[in-house]
Amino acid sequence: MIEVITAPEHKYLYPSAVKVFLAGGIQKCPEWQKQIADALVKDYNDLNPLDYGFGRDIVLMNPRRAEWLNEPGAAQKQIEWEFDMIEKCDIFTMYFSGGESDQPICMYELGRNIERMKQKFPNDWMNRIVITCDSDYKRVNDVVIQTDLASDQRLGVSVVEGKDESIKEHFEKIKSYLKTWTRKPLT
């Protein structure tokens, strides 16, 4: 089963589930998180679920709210939700879309979360991070430099031409990681 949790939802997350955080631009960016989630759910439902592993559930954590509430404390709750979900994730993904926004908060979050994954999963952290850039993203070079510096080795940022193609590449990489991680035995 694939479940999508959207901010600010809080649900019990089964320890055996593979948890994936969909980080990346939200404001002035396409709704790529929903495209990824919908494609993964469709792919999972179209295939034999055993292709994804042996009964391991998948939880996609989407920080994009259906609608933003302009009320006191909304930003605080959003950021707390994101920190909580990122701390629980097994796979961290970040997508940088082309368009109006430079996504400066995402640039900060990228380095911070590479470090977090290195500390949480010291033996296999590189197999738990997916980073993709639309070639139209204004700061592609900054993303590549930051990931190289944060990881002490080439992490492998995918830079793909075109919004649809880059989202498809991000989907394929996440799907590949999920097929690997849902097959791993529970520890």
Locations of the language-model features?
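Conserved catalytic or regulatory cores that recognize and/or transform ribose-phosphate-containing ligands
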Residues: 1-187
